């Protein structure tokens, strides 16, 4: 955990590279599957209960700004943190995504858990957080158990399992390359690594 904290601080305070880095398999990335996705994509695995995911938010925001136009950015919430509320907040993310209010809701949930230290204890608490973010509670009610949201949650679990995700935050590029952040020294180096993996053909 201490290593991850040092890494995150380094990524945030060192925005520019002095030289173009050389990225190597099993040092900067791992191959987790043998085939690429049909179209270029970056998938972030995260949990609202993960403090490092919260600290990673500005880094991911900068990454999204710099991704090529043809690259799809996806977020996959995992259910293995947060005990019984883990799956509930995984479903909450799906609701926010379906209602196209994720950018409003995610900061509110992260703040409640990571800054205020007062995580939601029930679906009613989650609903209240949506309302705090400006979402009509009735819209939440109509979506939370919908077929669409249930299907999204099932896909999140399939992604987590098929890519063998055991820790967050994790970033997978083109469904094949798992980013290793241990040796990354800045946000720009992290983004350069992601772009490098997007271009890999082997």
Walk through the language-model features, giving the residues of each.
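Generic detector of short, locally flexible boundary/turn motifs and exposed helical patches
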Residues: 37-43, 58-60, 92-93, 132-138, ...
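Sec/Tat-exported extracytoplasmic proteins
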Residues: 49, 64-67, 96-100, 109, ...
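Extracytoplasmic/secreted envelope proteins and their assembly/folding machinery
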Residues: 57-64, 86-93, 106, 123, ...
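Extracytoplasmic thiol/disulfide redox context detector
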Residues: 3-82, 157, 161-162, 195-202
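Structural microenvironment flanking redox-active thiols in thiol-disulfide oxidoreductases
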Residues: 67-98, 103, 107, 111-131
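Aromatic side chains
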Residues: 29-30, 45-48, 93, 110, ...
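Solvent-exposed, acidic/flexible segments
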Residues: 39, 49-56, 82-89, 98-102, ...
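C-terminal cap of thioredoxin/glutaredoxin-like
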Residues: 47, 132-202
């Amino acid at each position: 955990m201490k290593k991850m904290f040092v890494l995150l601080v380094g990524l945030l305070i060192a925005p520019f590279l002095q030289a173009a880095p050389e990225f190597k398999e099993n040092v900067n990335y791992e191959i987790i599957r043998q085939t690429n996705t049909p179209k270029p994509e970056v998938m972030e695995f995260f949990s609202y209960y993960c403090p490092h995911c919260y600290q990673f938010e500005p880094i991911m925001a900068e990454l999204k700004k710099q991704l090529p136009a043809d690259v799809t950015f996806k977020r996959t919430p995992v259910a293995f943190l947060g005990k019984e509320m883990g799956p509930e907040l995984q479903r909450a993310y799906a609701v926010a995504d379906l209602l196209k209010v994720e950018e409003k809701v995610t900061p509110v949930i992260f703040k409640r858990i990571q800054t205020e230290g007062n995580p939601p204890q029930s679906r009613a608490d989650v609903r209240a957080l949506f309302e705090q973010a400006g979402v009509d509670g009735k819209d939440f009610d109509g979506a939370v158990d919908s077929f669409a949201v249930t299907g999204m949650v099932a896909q999140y679990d399939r992604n987590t399992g098929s890519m063998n995700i055991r820790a967050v935050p994790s970033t997978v590029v083109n469904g094949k390359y798992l980013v290793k952040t241990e040796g990354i020294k800045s946000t720009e180096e992290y983004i350069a690594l992601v772009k490098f993996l997007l271009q890999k053909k082997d």
